[in-house]
Amino acid sequence: MILHKMAFLAVILFFLISSSSVCVHSRETFACDTKDAATATLRFCQLSVPIPERVRDLIGRLTLAEKVSLLGNTAAAIPRLGIKGYEWWSEALHGVSNVGPGTKFGGVYPAATSFPQVITTVASFNASLWESIGRVVSNEARAMYNGGVGGLTYWSPNVNILRDPRWGRGQETPGEDPVVAGKYAASYVRGLQGNDRSRLKVAACCKHFTAYDLDNWNGVDRFHFNAKVSKQDIEDTFDVPFRMCVKEGNVASIMCSYNQVNGVPTCADPNLLKKTIRNQWGLNGYIVSDCDSVGVLYDTQHYTGTPEEAAADSIKAGLDLDCGPFLGAHTIDAVKKNLLRESDVDNALINTLTVQMRLGMFDGDIAAQPYGHLGPAHVCTPVHKGLALEAAQQGIVLLKNHGSSLPLSSQRHRTVAVIGPNSDATVTMIGNYAGVACGYTSPVQGITGYARTIHQKGCVDVHCMDDRLFDAAVEAARGADATVLVMGLDQSIEAEFKDRNSLLLPGKQQELVSRVAKAAKGPVILVLMSGGPIDISFAEKDRKIPAIVWAGYPGQEGGTAIADILFGSANPGGKLPMTWYPQDYLTNLPMTEMSMRPVHSKRIPGRTYRFYDGPVVYPFGHGLSYTRFTHNIADAPKVIPIAVRGRNGTVSGKSIRVTHARCDRLSLGVHVEVTNVGSRDGTHTMLVFSAPPGGEWAPKKQLVAFERVHVAVGEKKRVQVNIHVCKYLSVVDRAGNRRIPIGDHGIHIGDESHTVSLQASTLGVIKS
């Protein structure tokens, strides 16, 4: 009997192992199947042959019709060469998403880890965290690819600048600062793609190039919008994240946008695609259109007279892949009409097929490849969920804390009223471009882990159109030891296709907050969920609301993270990655006005902290802690000589063109002592700003470095920051030339400042 049971268990174990193997490797071999004798010996299938030669061999075997069938996101199969069809469009903005058709949840892959929305994660100012998230997302992406339910080409991240606070997609971005956006882009991309420059774990894509930050405002939509942008703003704002993504992140793809820039659709502009991305920055990858944007430039923008001209213009400009059917429908006729050469099509395929080969898609059996072991057991793991919680904790920003109202205490605040339309939020917490989360902890569930809760929504939803639920909310606050109001926005207010018209809380939310605060017995904590900034000046000024927290969209573990912050299990260290403007900022400021700098003749106030110096609700970089940190600039040079290449004439006026300076290893080293003089251990986000010498070129200040450092109570830590002079202390003139201003540059870290003088020199001798 025992032997029979053992035999039965052995059979069950065999089937479990077998089914697990099937789950991991349920995808058919994409190409170069070693079991297919007809194709296994083809040169493009030989791993010993360099990838460029394999790509050329494959293209040489294709007919024109077959080549064109590979130009769209839904690439056709080439059965005679043993190549399966492939869907290029997958998304992984902050976790594997099912927005694109390349990824489907279900079966043994019901979900994936959903991290905080990008704007929240960026508030951590933690580049190592950003890269760690990328590694987790790519592990889960590879696992789903192995299981036949995901792709390997992910059109993420979105690295556009949050230029205008009304933009519905601001939540997807790394905020308003171009250096932060670029650092985020490079870090997340490295996490996604891995560290092998010749091989890829997955292929990332930085989007949407360029000057795209308007979806649908006041009758103007992204499909019709012509962004009129100066060379100065292109160089020092809009292009910076993309340049860093390519040069520092080695991204495998760039996506061009729907809008025109100075009258030319971005996806048909050779100056943007071929000259800038490909030749100047050295993209090692492919350029893809935003979905249907090639069709948009013909059908909607009427940029060309015929569809064949639109196809030809896009490919000749440097576009390699069309998200949509347009190139597939019109490229053959463009070749027949001599608008396009077949070699132009070949050049596009070189870039896409090279990426597929770097991904291992032409290397045969998945199981034999470096990531072939990944499967269902590697998705939604406890470690991944823990990182999602950590990311939310690090990104949450404490905006106000008068009288040390926070953290709450489970002993003193035994009963907490949890009120507001986002108090029981789940899907709202993951923002847009998300997938199916592993599970959710809502704010009220998180707080219930620390205290008894009285839950009243107060508003049916974030639109808060009436006050019929107000009385119950007020009564809950009257009877509780503390009150937490979870208010804000969701995707019905701000999203793709939805730009805001106001920075105020929607509907009657402000009235609910004020009425509850007035009646509450204990401290009132306002928690905000949003991607963009909100004008909550009323709450900042209200003494009955002693604490305010911005949670952004904190991801699947958001409720736990919020509760951990409120009750002090985690010490907040996040900083705002965007300026919070008052509602009055929008007066006479159309979203269509692209100038970053003030335009006094039009009463345009300037955009972002770099160029706007008017009143704010909260400034860029604002964020409090439960402890207190001090800075001391312990060591920094007072003079840095800038060696000039060639003749003395390269020093013009009060600046040196970066192209004329010897920039290699030209670095400003600053040693900063950070001391925790408070009563709790904490992590401090140190932001380093530069104030260049005055002049019409220069921003009033610009972020040049940031570091996140954990400091225990009473501890002092010395942090070294190295600032690349040519990259970060330069400014851009009106012609779009990057220059190093000669003279005194102020370096500011909190309340500490230091002046360093940059001086031109020849052969080590400083020139006045």
UniProtKB/Swiss-Prot annotation:
Pfam families: Fn3-like (PF14310), Glyco_hydro_3 (PF00933), Glyco_hydro_3_C (PF01915). The keyword Signal applies. The keyword DNA damage does not apply. Keywords: Extracellular matrix, Glycoprotein, Glycosidase, Hydrolase, Secreted, Signal. Disruption phenotype: Partially redundant with BXL1. Bxl1 and bxl2 double mutants have shortened siliques and curled leaf edges. GO terms for molecular function: xylan 1,4-beta-xylosidase activity. Expressed in leaves, stems, seedlings, roots, inflorescences and siliques. Its EC number is 3.2.1.-. One of its GO terms (cellular component) is extracellular region. The active site is at D290. GO terms for biological process: xylan catabolic process. This is Probable beta-D-xylosidase 2. It comes from Arabidopsis thaliana. The gene is BXL2.
